[in-house]
Amino acid sequence: MECFQVFEAGEGIERAILRGLSARGGLRGRCANGGHPALLVVSPRAAARGTRLPRQCRTVLLPGGMGGVPPRAASAVSYGASPRDSLTISSREEGALWAALQRELVTVEGQVVERQEFSLPLAPGEEELPLLACAGALLLLGIPPEELGQALS
């Protein structure tokens, strides 16, 4: 039984999620039941490589336009540059990426996060999509949008 599982190809997403969670005292509450992760996070490179994924989870966070067969999930949240994605890039400025939550989402604990924009710290040379994946995972794990910048810095 796991709260979340990350499928990645060296992007550092799981490490960033764990660092962000530890800054807030770790995970709280029930996360999974039935032996499946409450949250499955798929990185851009893992999706591009066609990484084999578990058959099911409660919520899946995946790159928009991901090919193949996604896991069976009660909820799917996409991230990427397309306006059709749930979590998108709104704009960029020096040292920051503005992300837009295009539709409300429900965290693994059942809290609703409303549509909004928020700033994320973007280090020089850092890739944008893995940063969006980290932000999306932290949102789904209960980190409020206004605390994401601090959790990811």
Ranges and model annotations:
Residues 72-84:
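Short, solvent-exposed linear motifs at loop/edge-of-secondary-structure regions
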Residues 1-75:
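Phosphate-binding loop of NTP-binding sites
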Residues 81-153:
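Adenine nucleotide phosphate-binding catalytic loops in nucleotide-utilizing enzymes
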Residues 9-10, 42-45, 62-65, 79-81, ...:
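Fold-independent oxyanion-binding glycine-rich loops
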